[in-house]
Amino acid sequence: MLRNEYSAHEIEAKWQRIWEEEGVFHAEPDSRKKFFLTIPYPYLNGNLHAGHTRTFTIGDAIARYHRMLGENVLFPMAFHATGTPIVGLSELIANRDPLIWDVYTRLHGIPEEELEKLTTPEAIVDYFRKQAKLAMRSIGYSIDWRREFTTTDPAYNRFIEWQFGILREKGYVTKGSHPVRWCPNDQNPVEDHDILRGEDATILDFTLIKFRLDDKVLPCATLRPETVFGVTNLWVNPNVVHYIARVNDEVWIVSPQAYHKLTFTDRSVKKIGEIPGEELIGKKARNPVTGDEIIILPATFVDPDSGSGIVMSVPAHAPLDYLALRDLYDADLSKYGITEDLRKIKFISLISVPEYGEFPAVDAVNELGVKDQNDPKAEEATKLVYRREFHNGVLKEITGRYAGTPVHRIKDILLQDLINQGVAEIFYEFSETPVICRCGARCVVKMVRDQWFLEYSDPVWKSRVLECLAGMQIIPEEMRAEFINKIDWLKDKACARRKGLGTRLPWDREWLIESLADSTIYMAFYILAKYVNAGMKIDRLVPQFFDYIFLGKGTPEEVSSLTGVDVDTVRRIREDFEYWYPVDLRTSGKDLVANHLLFFLYHHVAIFPESLWPRAIAVNGFVSLEGQKMSKSRGPILTLKQAVAENGADVTRLYILANAEYTQDADWRNDGAQATRGQVERFYTLAREIIERNDIDESAELTLIDRWMLSRLQRRIIETTDALNNIQTRRALQSAFYHMLNDLRWYERRGGRNQLRRILNVWVRLMAPFTPHICEEIWQNIGEGYVSRAPWPVPDASLIDEQAERAEAYLEQTQKDIEEIIRVTKTKPRRIVLYTTPVWKREMLRLALEVSKGGRLDMGALMKSAMGHPEIQSHKKDAPKYGGKLAKSVHALSGDVLALDELGILSREREYLSQAFGCPVEVYSADNPPYDPKGRAQNAEPGRPAIYIE
């Protein structure tokens, strides 16, 4: 029997122990249909947080669901440790960096005495691997832990070497010069996992246009080189001391920050002097494209860290330039030697766009009512003009031979021409700043020479990846367009570094394989990891071993002779791989769409035959905490361990899974979690009460409320099943938990009891993927074996009773109507009289449904038919008025109500209504009521009885 009190932690620890001892989630090949599901392995530089909780729990719920469908489910887990972050973290801990110590003691809850031990990468990996595993066990994930590994394991290193050998053979790994995100401190390229801040920043190729100031160059960075034809002035921040630098064979004037960035490019750069920005103000520069002489004006808004620190102004097409220039019209600039009237600066219109007149920037500012350059709406105006000009704009005659060219096509054409003329260069810059490495250093864009790259830009490779994507299920489907867009734009990526943890390039051992590049096909390694963990020899894992295991090349005997692994083991591993692969579902957070999930597809396409390509990807959103974005390096943060400690595993699972759907972001709120705990306790109490009841007669004839409840139960099975098939955990729980709670409340309120055990048996199985511990505890008292292995409920179509559902809906609505009248009138009823619809109104509704077409009711046709009906003819004075009412609501009319025996339903349930309201209830037909002191019977309509209360 269930205990009186729900003790979450005790129940959860009990079942976690039993599952592990009995190997309930161990998966081996057999005759069943297989389901291989994977989620991203966590990076071992901190404790698991609520973002992990959401992604991992979705994966576990789906794994449990498919297991109950009777499928053979493999749900494994491993740990990611390669790259530089862990090395950098160990150094910061060893140096007792105060920020790091605060983050890891306060946010991650690591005792100082433990943190003191984490001064080597190996210690950090070992500590967080154990913590992550404990956390995942504490929440009840149904993982086959025999297959775990860490990406620094020797066997995994051999696996990655094999993968990169194939990539190189196919020409996908090359050496060259490319712009990369670079950490000056670590002297390494950085990828998303290496970045502390600015992880969404991409590398943009700006055009540096070389304006001339005597014999010097004033380079201006722009994403829209076509606007050079409309430049009226340059902007310089007078408060910044600029550097004079020799860049190749030219002398440039740039901000100090720009100079720093230039030193990481493939240019020869040397500082030769300085010049205060204020000394540049008032001077005249020359536009290298148009030859126009333009004035340099002061602008404190110019960010020296953006571009070159010098900005070209195009007030006709850039709202911020227009506003800044307008703000200077009445300013005293005499200290810069500027005495001319800036109002005389003529705007230059160079783009024709349908939505605007000659000067789009001016029109947009006026349209949005932008006050000045500090108005937040100025940015909105800028984006609006840019978007409209990009999509609909065409260059005007002033641009010469480029006239008539659409704006969205001009950049590459013009850029190449300007480079050929020697008046422009490409300058790579981050899309957002700053970008901070996990070591704390500020990253730059560096042009790296002799760097190993993965050629993701290869057109043949791209086309194959798109082919793979086309054959996959993407959940939600609207994410497919984002995948296609990311694949189209994906460029070559640095795949090796010189520092950190990881696998060395087999042909160039000075380089370590980058941490995103080594985490692409690791799902295949889960098949092998079980044998490695069981003690298989790994010192001679040559490429031919992996060729056979994963590609079927060679023979078991050949592989055995090369590796020392016995023939039977080699053959079994190959058979296991053939059984389990490909991956049936990869579920992940949406932040990995732009990197890991793309590389996952790319590398599977490159390594494996089409039959082994992934079958489905599901993507979910982020998690915030009390409305704030979480950060494991800055806070706030809710660790998985903390969530389970405070709420219990099942409450944590239920709350996070019901919080949001698909790519919607979830918001963890502690009061919401507490409310969920109360609902889980209610579930437990209901189950205990049902188990303990001794007044249940399962052989009794089904009553109306029994038929209704069993019908609703079938619908809940159908809804929950459909939702889980579509990875919609929120919708699944709305049906399986919240709607079921409401259904049971109504069932018991109506006196239902004989089907409670039958209902509980189904309900517990519906809830098992979401709240497995409490469901195992209940199932132990009502079922056989483990609910985790119990068959998923199958709906019985013969129990779907629409008549019973309509009858109960009618009764419930009638009860609500009575309650509303009592509430409004503040009456304590002594007597309630109900009048069901008269026959003539039922017939009128029937005719209205027959003559209505396309949602419209022809009153003439209705009345013509009605007057030929004897029941209606006797009410010919009232019929037109009721017909008019029907005409207004024809779009909502349904024939279902005509199937209701309203008088019979209310008469049979008169006793129930009397008990509900504590007074006698009488039921009459409105056709001939024996008691109607206020004439209420005339108000009765189909589906809505008239109500009289004394």
From Swiss-Prot:
Name listed for the protein in its UniProt record: Leucine--tRNA ligase
Region called Disordered, residue ranges: 928-950
Motif 'KMSKS' region per record, residues: 629-633
Motif 'HIGH' region per record, residues: 42-52
Similarity annotation: Belongs to the class-I aminoacyl-tRNA synthetase family.
Residues bound to ATP: 632
Any one biological process term the GO annotation gives: leucyl-tRNA aminoacylation
Catalytic reactions of this protein: tRNA(Leu) + L-leucine + ATP = L-leucyl-tRNA(Leu) + AMP + diphosphate
Subcellular location: Cytoplasm
Pfam families in UniProt: Anticodon_1 (PF08264), tRNA-synt_1 (PF00133), tRNA-synt_1g (PF09334)
Gene3D superfamilies, A to Z: Class I aminoacyl-tRNA synthetases (RS), HUPs, Isoleucyl-tRNA Synthetase, Domain 1, leucyl-tRNA synthetase, Valyl/Leucyl/Isoleucyl-tRNA synthetase, editing domain
GO MF, one example: ATP binding
A GO-annotated cellular component: cytoplasm
Keywords: Aminoacyl-tRNA synthetase, ATP-binding, Cytoplasm, Ligase, Nucleotide-binding, Protein biosynthesis
